[in-house]
Amino acid sequence: MTAHIRPDLASIPAYVPGRNFPGAIKLASNETTVGPLPGVRDAVADAVANANRYPDNAAVALIEALASFLKVEPANVAAGCGSVTLCQELVQITCDQGDEVIYAWRSFEAYPVVTQVGHAVSVKVPLTEDFGHDLDAMLAAITDRTRLIFVCNPNNPTGNALSKAELESFLDAVPAHVVVALDEAYFEYSRSDADGIELFRSRPNVVVLRTFSKAYGLAGIRVGYAVADPEIIVALGKVHTPFTVSAVAQAAAIASLAAADELLARTEGVIAERTRVRTALIEAGYTVPESSANFVYLPLGELSPAFAEASTEAGILIRQYGVEGVRMTIGDPHENDAFLAFADTDVAKQAAGIGVSA
């Protein structure tokens, strides 16, 4: 093949989705188990009837619905094919070659990918000892080449959530020309007092990213959104790939916004299960940081590969993060029970380095 391919692509870490195989209990991808919210199926069916037509590239109806729901102006909202595409677009609109993007590590796996694809340089700031954002270190990492900071709150994969006071102090210390993206993919599962929309209102350099993939149950349809200053929204529109937010996605998202009561009931159920699972794991001898998302994190270090492999052999798929830890999605109660039963076995505890009886 004679085509010229960017040489640096060889060093880009490919995004690795959660695995799946027939018959397995899949607790690897932070998906909801209950499907779309009420009204979504009918909205999708109506949209499919016009699948021969291009979607509204401006997503006017969706943006107006989001603006009303969030109590912002339509000029403050952009739609995307999941919030990850908006992450990519933020790098594109803020960074020239060699500019820097700061984020905690470990955090969302897509950050290093979108940064390098955008010809920018990743500045990874290690998490604190309790697996949260080290905001002071992130501030200290800012240079004259810093253009963008990602703050995943709650953090994926560790689950920690920052408070309103912590974020206010951090945001007010960031130079006004540096864009801060508050990635709130798991916002609906958090009961922290931090709300990115409220933090954005008085800070034009703050962008809030949210998605319909998690709590709203639309992971397979792909739709997310950004809330930001109109100048940023206009710039996002200039790099947006046309028609990537399908008519089906737009219709499903609009219908989802009308089911707030059901969404709250579902997220409360997940939170109750999250608490139950974390408590049981701690009682079994595991270290489990407090989580504000729909998953729990086990910081097993170098034992992570062995534990993940043992879990797979038991028919339960979880997410391994190198030699740092593993993440377990909160599923249905019977799925969670299966994982807890595995985690309490001698095989699992030996893999995790937890003492077991002879």
Curated annotation (Swiss-Prot):
Gene3D superfamilies noted in UniProt: Aspartate Aminotransferase, domain 1 (3.90.1150.10), Type I PLP-dependent aspartate aminotransferase-like (Major domain) (3.40.640.10)
Q: Which domain of life is it from?
A: Bacteria
**Enzyme Commission no:** 2.6.1.57
Residues bearing N6-(pyridoxal phosphate)lysine? 214
- Cited SUPFAM superfamilies: PLP-dependent transferases (SSF53383)
Single GO molecular function = histidinol-phosphate transaminase activity
Keyword field: Aminotransferase, Pyridoxal phosphate, Transferase
Which cofactor does the UniProt annotation name? Answer: pyridoxal 5'-phosphate
Per the record, what are the reactions this protein catalyses?
A: an aromatic L-alpha-amino acid + 2-oxoglutarate = an aromatic oxo-acid + L-glutamate
Query: A single Pfam family, by name?
Result: Aminotran_1_2
GO terms (BP aspect): L-histidine biosynthetic process
InterPro entries registered for this protein in UniProt: Aminotrans_II_pyridoxalP_BS, Aminotransferase_I/II_large, ArAT, HisP_aminotrans, HistidinolP_aminotransfase, PyrdxlP-dep_Trfase, PyrdxlP-dep_Trfase_major, PyrdxlP-dep_Trfase_small
State the oligomer form and interacting partners. Answer: Homodimer.
Annotated function:
Aminotransferase that catalyzes the conversion of aromatic amino acids and 2-oxoglutarate into corresponding aromatic oxo acids and L-glutamate.
Identify its protein family: Belongs to the class-II pyridoxal-phosphate-dependent aminotransferase family.
Q: Which PANTHER family does its entry note? A: HISTIDINOL-PHOSPHATE AMINOTRANSFERASE (PTHR43643:SF3), HISTIDINOL-PHOSPHATE AMINOTRANSFERASE 2 (PTHR43643)
Protein name, please?
A: Aromatic amino acid aminotransferase
Q: Could you tell me the gene encoding this protein?
A: pat
